[in-house]
A protein has these predicted regions:
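Pyridoxal 5′-phosphate
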Residues: 1-126
Length: 126
């Protein structure tokens, strides 16, 4: 099978998958739990966050973990819209966006934002 929809799902690199499985086996507790296993999971999560932040050149507090793409899209779109509302409340997107993007834009529209959705031609071009 040739899978071409990497926008929706992307196979994990085997090395990444191995690291994930090892961490999943070792750190079984909720990192917000107060018991020892939770504290160990929290320490590993903080170590990983520090490593990611260093590689990205940001502060660890700037990294936000979400449960998936829909939550991340919602947080990013509404967050930047509200943070930039003093500049303007006009957002341009496309008809091709993920449904979570559309839902966020609809919510913003109900709060006074002007939303324009551009059409895509048969070649996928705006």
């Amino acid at each position: 099978m040739i899978y071409l929809d990497y926008s929706a799902n992307t196979p994990a690199d085997p090395e990444v998958l191995d690291a994930y499985v090892a961490a999943e086996r070792r750190y079984i507790a909720n990192p917000n739990s107060t018991h020892i296993a939770g504290q160990e999971a929290r320490a590993e999560m903080e170590r990983a966050t520090q490593s990611i932040a260093q590689r990205l050149g940001v502060q660890p507090a700037e990294i936000i973990y979400t449960s998936g793409a829909s939550e991340a899209n919602n947080l990013a779109i509404k967050g930047i819209a509200h943070a930039s509302r003093h500049i303007g409340k006009h957002i341009i997107s496309t008809q091709l966006e993920h449904s979570s993007v559309g839902a966020s834009l609809t919510a913003l529209q109900q709060h006074g934002y002007e939303i324009d959705l551009l059409d895509i031609n048969r070649d996928g071009r705006v």
